[in-house]
Every structure is written in C-alpha cells, then in structure tokens.
Curated annotation (Swiss-Prot):
Consists of three domains; the N-terminal catalytic domain, the editing domain and the C-terminal C-Ala domain. The editing domain removes incorrectly charged amino acids, while the C-Ala domain, along with tRNA(Ala), serves as a bridge to cooperatively bring together the editing and aminoacylation centers thus stimulating deacylation of misacylated tRNAs. The lineage of its organism: Bacteria, Pseudomonadati, Chlorobiota, Chlorobiia, Chlorobiales. It comes from Chlorobium chlorochromatii (strain CaD3). Catalyzes the attachment of alanine to tRNA(Ala) in a two-step reaction: alanine is first activated by ATP to form Ala-AMP and then transferred to the acceptor end of tRNA(Ala). Also edits incorrectly charged Ser-tRNA(Ala) and Gly-tRNA(Ala) via its editing domain. It comes from the Bacteria. One of its GO terms (cellular component) is cytoplasm. It is found in: Cytoplasm. Its cofactor is Zn(2+). Zn(2+) binds at residues 570, 574, 673, 677. It holds the Pfam family DHHA1. Its EC number is 6.1.1.7. One of its GO terms (molecular function) is alanine-tRNA ligase activity. Its main location: cytoplasm. This is Alanine--tRNA ligase.
C-alpha cells in the first residue's frame, strides 16, 4: 500500500466504527501556553481530559501533525543519525470521550492490524501495565494473539501520565518483531530498533492528586497514538522510515538539486545529510504553513536552529546555496491533498525560508572560518574541548546555535564546554537585568503613596465617558511629581501599545493638568505635570499641591481631541493589520504596536521589505474600507474560547484573560483588544503610510498617520511638489520627474569630471613629490599628507603613481569627515626585489591613529580615529620601510 492509502485506510476504518474524523490541529497550539509545538495527537483534546471542555462527538479519529524539537520531547539531535527519529511526524489516533473503553480499543486495534492490514500475528507483541488484569484478559480472551506474546511492564513503560498531577492511566502497546528469525521477545521495550512499538493505547481512568494518590475519574477515556511514518515503513517492508514513499519525493528533489543520490546507509555522511535536510524541510514547511515565523526567541528560535542545522548539513553535499525553500513545492504536491494549507501557503512559506537561508549563508561562511581557526589551534595544542566563550562568540556574532557548534565539533572529534557557554549566556542575561534595574532605579523617585481608601483598584469608565465625577483614593508627591489614583476614571492608562490619555482634574481649589496615565497593578495612575491654584489665582508646582480629605472629589475630563485622534490611529491599525494579512499572507502577525494621537507604529512578522506596490495596495485597501463607513462593534466580557471560535486573532505567546474584550469591524477585522476605538471607521477620514523598515530579522515596521495628520502631510507634500515644479519650470508631474532625472545625470557627469580633474592634479603634485623623495637602498620612499582630498581620489592617484618610478613605496594620508584615511602603494620592483609589502607597512602606520587596515603587497588602505596623530603615522611608515631595507 502507498502511504496515502495507509492513512486513508486508518481513517476509513474508524469512521466505520462511528468515529468523527476531525482535521489535524495546527502544529502551533492556539490556546496552550505550556507547549511550543503540538507534539501528540491528544493535545487538541487536552481540555476534554481535564474536564474543562467538551466536543459535539464522543468518538474521534485523525492524523495529527506533530513536532518534537524542544523541551522534554526533543528528537532534534538524533535526526539523521538513525533510521526512525524525526522532528516532524504524523500521529494517527482514535479517541473515546467517556464512551467505549478497553475492550473496543484493543479488539479494534487488533482487527485493523491483522485483518485489514494483515500484519503477521506471530510477529506482534502486546504489552500491558503490570496491574492491569482487565487489559491482559481482553488480549488473551478477545483476540487470537499468542498468549506468550502478552507481556507485563511497570510504570516506566506502560503507565501514561499527562504531568505530575492530572489525568493518567495504564496503557497497552503493540510492538512488532523485525528480527530475521522472529526471536525478539526479549527485546520488547528495551529500545532496540529490531523490535519497535507501533501503537500505544492509553486508558485514562485516574486523576493523579498532588499527594500522589490516584482518584478514579467519573468518565473514562481512550487516547491512542500510532506513528504514521513508522507504520508505513513496516507495511512497505522497509528497514527505515526514511526508505518509504513518505520521504522518496524529497530525496528525489534533493538529488535533482545537488546531484547526490540517497544510498540509505546509516553512517554515510551524504545519507545522514539528506535525512536531516528532508526531515527539517518538513518541519519548517508545516510550522510556517500554520503561522509560525523564525525569530530569536521561543518557538521561532527553535525553527531557526532547525533551518541552520539543515543548511550546515547541505555543505556535506557540496551545496552552498539555499536549498530548503526548493523542497516546499515538493511537499505541497505530495501532501497538499491531506493538508491543504501546504498548497495555500506554498509561495509565502517558500519565500520566508529562502530569506532565512540567504541571511544565514552570509554569516555561515564567516562562522565556519572562525570555527576552523579554533579547531586548528586546538589541534596544535593537543586540546580536545572548544571553550564555552568561543561557542558563545559563534552564537552571539554569527548566529550559530550551540547544538550546531557541538555537531560540527563532534564531526572533527572535539567536544564543546557546555557549562562555559551557559555561563556566558547567563552573564549576558545578567547585564540585561542590570540595565533594566538601573532604569527602574532612575524611574523610582522613592516617594510613598498616601491612601484615602481601602480599595486601591480603579474602575475604567472611559469607553463610554470622557468626563466623569470621581474621588481621589491615592496620592503620591515628591521630586517635582504629583501622582493621583481615582476610584473611577475616564482616562485610558497606557497599555496594549496605546498611549495614556491626557486632560484635566479639577476640584474646588485646583485645576490639574494630567500629562499621562499609566497602570500600577489594578490602579490607574494620573501623572500631573502642571497645577493651578484657583484660590491663589496662580500656578503652583505639582509637588506643592495640598489636597485634604474634604477636597477629594474631582471632575475628570479627558482631552477630547487627543483621545479621538488616538482612536482613529488605533482602529486604523486594526484595518491595516487585516489588510497586511490579506495582501502579504496569514503569516503576518502583530509583534508590537504604538498608538498615540499623532501617529501609529505597527511591527509585524514578514520576511522581506515591502515593495512600493505592496505599500500602495495596503493604503488603498485601508482607505477603501474607511469609505465604507462601517460601524465598529465592541464586545465586552467575552469568553476567550468563544472569541477565538468567532475568528478573533490570538497568537501563541500572548497572555489573555479568561474573559476578553473583542473589537470587530464586520467583514474586515476581529481582534482581542482593550484599547479605545472610533464608533465608525468612516471617522478615521484618511490613512497614509509614511515609512516601512526592518526592526529585526523577520520583523518589519510600518509608521502611518490618519485624519488631520494625514491631510497635513499630503498638503505639505503637495506644496513641496509645487515649489519644485516652479523651480524647474516644469509642467505636469511627469515633467518634474524627467527634469530631476536629467539634473541627477548631469550632476553625476560633473562629479566624474571633477574627480578626474582632481586626481590628475593630485598625480601631478605627487609625481613631483616622488621625484624629490629620499632613496633608501635604491628605493624611493614617499610619506605625505594630502590635504583637501578624499579617499577615492587618493586611490586613483596612487594607481597612476606606481608607474612614475621603477622602485618606490609610498603612503598618502588625509583627514575626511574627522577620520584618518591612509592609502599605501609599492611598485612591482619594490615588492619583488626589496620584499616590501604595502599591506604590512600600512598596518604599522594605522596603529598610530588607533586604526587598522590592510590589503595586498602592491596596494593597501587603512583608516584611523585620531587625526591629531597623522604625522606620527607618516613617521611610523617611513621607519618601517627603513627597518625593512636595513
């Protein structure tokens, strides 16, 4: 049977047994902060086992996409070196939620294996938990397995637990004996590749309490899992998972790309490399298709490590170009029918992987050079361990994950000091913490809060009111500051990227200007910057304001215009986010935002610079939506799961409460958001992007303005265009572009002529200087400062100067933009007969100006930071020449 037939046969079998066939959950868990990746079929049903959720069915079956490349379940470093480990795999499984139990699970498993798939009964073994007599009897009495093939094991092998506490229970596994003579009984559960587990049937019947005792569950569940790649290899009679038709299309494509054929050898370097590349391409393609992005933290860094590990192995095949992105289409073709997201996201995933590959290849070569130097030094000193500090340098400077360095070291017969590496990592973290603590010390003025109420929390009423009567519950003064907490306030405190409101607080005596509003736990803190004493009719310092208990009542008024401008920008951010996901792809996820009354800034995951056409498309999409003037619907106090089910965007790594606020623009955008927004998107008026740039690898940033700020920007640009048109005496926009292009061409030509003229004049000056220069051992030595010249002119002049004397060596020096520029030359005869080296000589000169450089024997350049020592550099050059010539 082909692999796709085996998969479908499994699903059809359980569909006939009354199971609902459910789609695989994404490999990126949507609502489980304990997981980086989906690593088992049961992950999407975890809430059912924990009695926190339910399904509209009691029987289910699926094929689940899984990744095991981090944490407890981490197969990364074994991939390629054996025949059965994978970072990505499929898990076939069937489940019962309080419905059938051990009898059906065991007998159906046996039926599928021996009746439908016709696996040899004499080669199958069933293991049960040592105390699970019920399962033992079912195997013995309800199946025709050889009773001698029913084996009992203890907690380690046959008792499944979700964690230290929670649902758990005994399990029964089916193993197959692949030894030549069928003598593998003693190899069951010892980790021998000749007798392997095929299917694990877990019977969830207990709840492990914190004190360790087992409490029976009111409902018993069944959770089974079978590795798809493993069962395919067995049914196709292959000795390795990698020899089946699951991997053959990938190996064929790798051969097409590299010219290297897969030989199915366990130890051959080429075959190890091909297994790694094929496996890692699957992991990356599926993860990115489900919305993950490579990055420097969390799940993204695991994916980046996987990609870089595969690229390193591609060098073993003699291939030095991006390779993984070329396998995405092969996977989409082979598996897209079962997993349509591979086809839907193929183009974007390929582009993301290619961009990552190109980025790492630039540093890979430099890192390999450094690694080679380290290895050579160790060999010369008979060392065996690469220092942790060197491994950290490879990580910090060249992006080499530690396990990649360890892999390369093992290939060369060396080890890496892991403890030393971790020490360097910890030092870096400590420095970052120290910086943060220092900032906290600067921000903390040491003043104490005075509270007038036992209730410290503030109620926010600003969604519905911009003016509100409130009572002061807390006050803090000192160092020029006045901070106030109210029992209820219309002021929005900075959070979720939106800046805090400003406005006024007023009581019977004072009018206080609130410059900012921030959160401090559950309290909303109003930062007062200016105060006016109405009794004294004069301004007072905020720290001198005297508020007594009789004057705690205040009228709180938010600056209406500023709030409305911030709301325009915030709602526009939601529209832009949705437009980016439509235009660029669903891999776009918010990575950060800043929303103020003046502008908006949005950071998002994307792998390349946006083209002018893409930026224009985003602007057009947002402004088109604004003109639709749709209402903005705010849903308060929504269950998180209900919000996500209705399409609200929620991303792994973000923290959400059980109940959330949802901001919906019908048909356009649905997001979890606690910020303030316009009531109708038409009130945004106009949206204009002002910049797009990179802020980190795989993260782009867009800045934009809306409403009056956008109008102001457009009028400013229009006025500037009109001024340019008048200066150029141009008619129409095209004429302006043509005239400016013509001016630029003329400028370039004039600059070229000027440079040639200056170079010619400099050559003439230097030729005379060279003829007058002193000779040392028959070689003329020129060391001269050339004022009011740039480095490029000096380089051109130097090349011409080499023909002006048979044996000569020289150093030209100047100061350009406050930096020293040095250019050195040596004629062919000076190099050949006098063994002079311009590169070595210029390095001696550069030391005097705290600089460095180098080049070839005939020509070299250098720079420096100390113009005041220019004469010392010239003297050092001359001295070095004299020392060389004796």
């Amino acid at each position: 049977m082909k692999s796709h037939e085996i998969r479908q046969s499994f699903l059809d079998f359980f569909a006939q047994k009354g199971h609902t066939i459910v789609r695989s959950a994404p490999v990126i868990p949507a609502d489980d902060p304990t997981l980086l990746f989906t690593n088992a079929g049961m992950n999407q049903f975890k809430d059912v086992f924990l009695d926190k959720g339910s399904r509209p069915y009691v029987r289910a079956a699926d094929t689940q996409k899984c990744i095991r490349a981090s944490g407890k379940h981490n197969d990364l470093e074994d991939v390629g070196r054996d025949t059965y480990h994978h970072t990505f795999f499929e898990m076939l499984g069937n489940w019962s939620f309080g419905d059938y139990y051990k009898l059906e699970a065991i007998t159906w498993a046996w039926e599928l294996f021996t009746v439908v798939w016709k696996l040899p009964k004499e080669r199958l073994y069933a293991t049960v938990y040592q105390d699970d007599d019920e399962s033992f009897q079912i195997w013995k009495e309800q199946t025709d397995i050889n009773p001698d093939h029913i084996l009992r094991f203890g907690d380690k092998d046959n008792f499944w637990e979700m964690g230290e506490t929670g649902p758990c229970g005994p399990c029964s596994e089916i193993h197959i004996d692949l030894t030549p003579d069928g003598s593998g009984k003693e190899l069951v559960n010892v980790g021998d590749y000749r007798v392997i587990e095929l299917w694990n049937l877990v019977f969830i019947q207990y709840n492990r309490q914190s004190d360790g005792h087992l409490e029976p569950l009111p409902k018993k569940h069944v959770d089974t899992g079978m590795g798809f790649e493993r069962i395919v290899a067995v049914m196709q009679g292959k000795g390795s998972n990698y020899d089946s038709d699951v991997f053959q299309p990938l190996f064929d494509k790798i051969t097409e790309i590299t010219g290297v054929r897969y030989g199915a050898s366990l130890d051959a370097p080429n075959d190890i490399a091909m297994r790694v590349i094929a496996d890692h391409a699957r992991t990356l393609t599926f993860a990115l298709s489900d919305g993950a992005m490579p990055s420097n933290e969390g799940r993204g860094y695991v994916l980046r490590r996987i990609l870089r590990r595969a690229l390193r192995y591609s060098r073993n095949l003699g291939y030095h170009q991006p390779i993984l992105h070329q396998l995405v289409g092969t996977l989409a073709l082979a598996m897209g029918e079962v997993f349509p997201e591979l086809v839907q996201r193929q183009e974007a995933v390929s582009a993301i992987i290619k961009a990552e590959e190109e980025s790492f290849i630039v540093t890979l070569d430099r890192g390999i050079d450094l690694f080679s130097e380290l290895v050579e030094k160790l060999r010369a000193s008979n060392g065996k361990v690469i220092a942790g500090s060197d491994a950290f340098r490879l990580y910090d400077t060249y992006g080499f994950p530690f396990d990649l360095t360890r892999l390369m070291a093992a290939d060369e017969g060396f080890e890496v000091d892991g403890e030393g590496f971790e020490h360097c990592m910890q030092e870096q973290k400590n420095r970052a913490r120290s910086d943060r603590r220092e900032k906290q010390r600067v921000d903390d003025d040491g003043a104490k809060w005075q509270w007038f109420s036992d209730v410290r929390a503030s109620q926010f009423v600003g969604y519905d009111h911009l003016v509100h009567s409130a009572t002061i519950t807390g006050i803090r003064q000192g160092n020029g500051k006045l901070l106030l907490v109210l029992d209820a306030t219309p002021f929005y405190a900075e959070s979720g990227g939106q800046t805090g409101d400003n406005g006024w607080l007023e009581n019977s005596r004072y009018r206080l200007h609130v410059a900012d509003t921030v959160k401090d736990g559950d309290a909303i803190v109003h930062v007062v910057s200016d105060a006016f004493d109405k009794v004294q009719d004069s301004a007072v310092q905020p720290e001198d304001v005297e508020i007594v208990e009789q004057e705690l009542a205040v009228a709180a008024s938010v600056h209406r215009t500023a709030r409305q401008d911030a709301e325009r920008n915030h709602t526009a951010t939601h529209l832009m986010h949705a437009a980016l996901r439509r235009i660029l792809g669903e891999h776009v996820q918010q990575k950060g935002s800043f929303v103020s009354p003046e502008r908006l800034r949005f950071d998002f995951s994307h792998f390349s610079k946006l083209t002018d056409e893409e930026i224009e498309a985003v602007e057009i999409a947002v402004n088109t939506q604004i003109r639709e003037a749709e209402p903005v619907v705010k849903h308060a106090d929504v269950l998180f799961d209900d919000a996500v089910a209705k399409g609200a965007l929620a991303f792994f790594g973000d923290k959400y409460a059980d109940r959330v606020r949802v901001v919906e623009i019908p048909g356009m955008s649905v997001e979890l958001c606690g910020g303030t927004h316009v009531d109708n998107i038409g009130r945004i008026g106009l949206f204009k992007i002002i910049s797009e740039a990179s802020v980190a690898s795989g993260v782009r940033r867009i800045e934009a303005v809306t409403g009056k700020a956008a109008e102001k920007l457009l009028w400013q640009e229009y006025r500037e265009l009109q001024q340019i048109r008048q200066l150029l005496k141009a008619k129409g926009d095209e004429a302006v572009v043509e005239k400016v292009a013509g001016l630029m061409d003329s400028k370039k030509e004039l600059e070229k002529e000027l440079a040639e003229s200056r170079a010619a004049a400099l050559v003439e000056q230097l030729t005379a200087a060279l003829q007058a220069a002193p000779e040392v051992s028959g070689c003329r030595v020129l060391a001269i400062e050339v004022k009011n010249n740039d480095g490029e002119t000096m380089r051109q002049a130097t090349m011409a100067l080499r023909d002006k004397a048979p044996c000569a060596v020289g150093l030209l020096a100047t100061v350009e933009a406050g930096k020293v520029v040095l250019v050195s030359f040596a004629t062919d005869e000076a190099v050949r007969t006098c063994s002079l080296d311009a590169g070595a000589l210029i390095r001696e000169a550069a030391k005097q100006v705290q600089g460095g450089g180098g080049g070839k024997a005939e020509f070299a350049t250098a720079g420096g930071k100390q113009p005041e020592n220019l004469s010392k550099a010239l003297d050092a050059f001359t001295a070095a020449v004299r020392a060389k010539l004796g």
